[in-house]
Amino acid sequence: MFVDSVEIIIASGKGGPGMVSFRREKFVIKGGPDGGDGGDGGDVYFEVDNNTDTLASFRGTKHHKAKNGAPGGTRNCAGKKGEDKIIVVPPGTQVFVDDALWLDLVEPKERVLALKGGKGGLGNAHFKSATKQQPTYAQKGLEGVEKCVRLELKLIADIGLVGFPNAGKSTLISTISNAKPKIANYEFTTLVPNLGVVSVDEKSEFLMADIPGIIEGASEGKGLGISFLKHIERTKVLAFVLDASRLDLGIKEQYQRLRLELEKFSPALANKPFGVLLNKCDVVENIDEMAKDFCTFLNLEAQKLEAFGLEPYLGFLHPHLTSDFENNPNEKSALFVLPLSALSALNTHALKFVLLEALP
């Protein structure tokens, strides 16, 4: 089950109480105080685990508390510190307190201290003085800290797929990566985001994210896309997946409507480097002319993608690819326009290299 938002209560441990005791030895009638200090309460940490990409483990487990510190002992023995609570979260988890961002956990194996445990109380040995040789009191341990927090997951991926329902995004990610999403010939087959690792060669790989299809009005809450657009906010490059076979909505209109929804949701998201994939090209006549015309529409002065071992349908590549985005952050031209067929794996092998080259 994919879960990307939960509310939990976290609490650090209470400090253990100090001990009231006196030294007892043979022939010693009144030994001095020797009560030990209480142990500190356990701390609460958040730890990033790369092996998970959902917050589903928090369903049904609302309270997460560290252990209390142990009481102090006799003979000046300090109590044991309470056991820490390690809360494991997927990379990209944000922690909110009262709707304000508190922690943003993105680094693999990152461990962040969230709450410090209460300090253990002092034993009566600390309170001996010239006028008080036999103190009969010790400190209580300090209380721990409790917070109600909301965990929000924003997946971290290199490439984010954007498209209308049934454009073939799920088929594409299943073809070129290790992801195994549900695939069917109807809209909204994808109900949750999917992550897949794309292996290009023995040394190179990148992470791809597929979110549920976007419909018009998604930025205003229609359909499923708005709930998951946040999952492509962290991606480095967007890939617009357009259905070249649609008769009711051309590729230019598909692109314009998708971009409009992104701009409404987040201008920063809409300004990310991007490329365009013309899917289902194997059932379209004159796909090369369609791709050339689309490049003109995008004002893309492109060169053919002959170096990537393409199938009969050629793609088009922005000259110098990523350097233009690095040197001109306001550049809006596409990095590539590539006809392909996810179903028949046409040009999908070349796509891996194109996407790898497109990454900053």
Curated annotation (Swiss-Prot):
Under SUPFAM superfamilies, the record lists: Obg GTP-binding protein N-terminal domain, P-loop containing nucleoside triphosphate hydrolases
Detail which positions bind Mg(2+): S170, T190
What Gene3D superfamilies does the record point to? GTP1/OBG domain (2.70.210.12), P-loop containing nucleotide triphosphate hydrolases (3.40.50.300)
Magnesium among the record's keywords? yes
List positions binding GTP. Answer: 163-170, 188-192, 210-213, 279-282, 341-343
Where in or outside the cell is it found? Cytoplasm
InterPro entries with a match to the protein in the record: G_OBG, GTP-bd, GTP-bd_Obg/CgtA, GTP1-OBG_CS, GTP1_OBG_dom, GTP1_OBG_dom_sf, OBG_GTPase, P-loop_NTPase
Q: Which GO terms describe its cellular component?
A: cytoplasm
Q: What is its EC number?
A: 3.6.5.-
Name the predominant localization.
cytoplasm
- A Pfam family annotated for this chain is MMR_HSR1
UniProt entry keywords in alphabetical sequence:
Cytoplasm, GTP-binding, Hydrolase, Magnesium, Metal-binding, Nucleotide-binding
EC primary class: hydrolase
What Gene Ontology molecular function terms does this protein carry?
GTP binding; GTPase activity; magnesium ion binding
Stated role: An essential GTPase which binds GTP, GDP and possibly (p)ppGpp with moderate affinity, with high nucleotide exchange rates and a fairly low GTP hydrolysis rate. Plays a role in control of the cell cycle, stress response, ribosome biogenesis and in those bacteria that undergo differentiation, in morphogenesis control.
Into which family does the record put it?
Belongs to the TRAFAC class OBG-HflX-like GTPase superfamily. OBG GTPase family.
- What is the name listed in the Swiss-Prot or TrEMBL entry for this protein? GTPase Obg
Q: Which organism is it from?
A: Helicobacter pylori (strain Shi470)
